[in-house]
Amino acid sequence: VGFKAGVKDYKLTYYTPDYETKDTDILAAFRVTPQPGVPPEEAGAAVAAESSTGTWTTVWTDGLTSLDRYKGRCYHIEPVPGEESQFIAYVAYPLDLFEEGSVTNMFTSIVGNVFGFKALRALRLEDLRIPTAYVKTFQGPPHGIQVERDKLNKYGRPLLGCTIKPKLGLSAKNYGRAVYECLRGGLDFTKDDENVNSQPFMRWRDRFLFCAEAIYKSQAETGEIKGHYLNATAGTCEDMMKRAVFARELGVPIVMHDYLTGGFTANTTLAHYCRDNGLLLHIHRAMHAVIDRQKNHGMHFRVLAKALRMSGGDHIHAGTVVGKLEGEREITLGFVDLLRDDFIEKDRSRGIYFTQDWVSLPGVLPVASGGIHVWHMPALTEIFGDDSVLQFGGGTLGHPWGNAPGAVANRVALEACVQARNEGRDLAREGNDIIREACKWSPELAAACEVWKEIKFEFEAMDTL
């Protein structure tokens, strides 16, 4: 026999602490929790092997290729402070292992079978460094932040949205009516809920028609460009494309997709169509918590966010920060920057393990939504800045006077915060006062403030930065 048969020690081949990473390598940071008795080098090497060229035993066909050229390498291991049995393994993958322009293929390798590997108790992908050479094979977001602002003719402030509730059960006409009321009141966007697809009580085509009517009517009334995220997510790619095509025929500005449940292949297909046809693409992250919520296993949302920027989307939901823990604020702002900026420096305090250069791939607007209302507006304006979409579902529709006054309240609060910021006032310290002053000339805002006043507004902690 021309080769040595038998089960292999991974670390002989796949643990290479002297390796100098290449600019073209995809780099991954894994949080590894090995089974008791498995040394870190062996576990790290096993991760590199199982997510690249390795198999559990030496095979005859290894001799027909150059392992050195194609293998993943565990090139560095560092302990996790405060965790005895955990460490971070850094793995470098040669670029040739991945199909160009395919997030699907990248994930199949890097977060594929290796996550079920027996020698590990748990495995979490914390971050990826996408090399510029690979970034350039992706189209990325259909339009990006600047083009979106130009299309909408809205500058110098965050955009306002609202998810239409109750999310399931309204007829198409009543749904369109709710959309119209919100847009007329001063919102920029309304949104299909992520689970509104095409159910018996409201088929997609009827909803699209009535929402388009609401958009045109509110545009004529307000003189502003309006949009409604029409959810094109469907059971098959063909149905999804049918919905996107119909949206384009109606002349609406934006459609929506659930990128994790719909899948990366479908998402990239839709993103390409959106760029070719001038549609903005709003992305919802339903199912993300199944993947990213466990600290020890799965993958961090910043990886899903990077993958979305490659696959394509103009907006993506990114949490709210408000009312969360201080540490989470920094981590959230870390991946918000990864979505928006062109070049992001490595910064472990914000959870960013690698410097990422997006080489002019368009940026994605982060969407803050979930449990926010007018009292949060100063905090949101301060934290997210202008390039964001602030979405108030219940915070609009829960207004005691109805949808349009709810929209007015949010718009007045936003404009007051932006104006105060531009005048140099400190939103962190004066947030409550700014909202209270604005109440004097907006009865709608005063009513909203009254409804949600007992909900605490904790925002002092910013001063510690």
Curated annotation (Swiss-Prot):
Instruction: Work out whether the entry's keyword set contains Cytoplasm.
Output: no
CDD domains per the record? RuBisCO_large_I
Q: Where is the active site?
A: K165, H284
Cellular component aspect of the GO annotation:
chloroplast
What would you give as a GO molecular function for this chain, any one? Answer: magnesium ion binding
N6,N6,N6-trimethyllysine: modified positions: K4
| Alphabetically ordered keywords of this record | Calvin cycle, Carbon dioxide fixation, Chloroplast, Disulfide bond, Lyase, Magnesium, Metal-binding, Methylation, Monooxygenase, Oxidoreductase, Photorespiration, Photosynthesis, Plastid
Taking the record's annotation, the residue ranges forming a coiled coil are none
Q: Which GO terms describe its biological process?
A: photorespiration; reductive pentose-phosphate cycle
Do you know which HAMAP family this protein is assigned to?
A: RuBisCO_L_type1
Q: What is this protein called?
A: Ribulose bisphosphate carboxylase large chain
Tell me what gene encodes this: rbcL
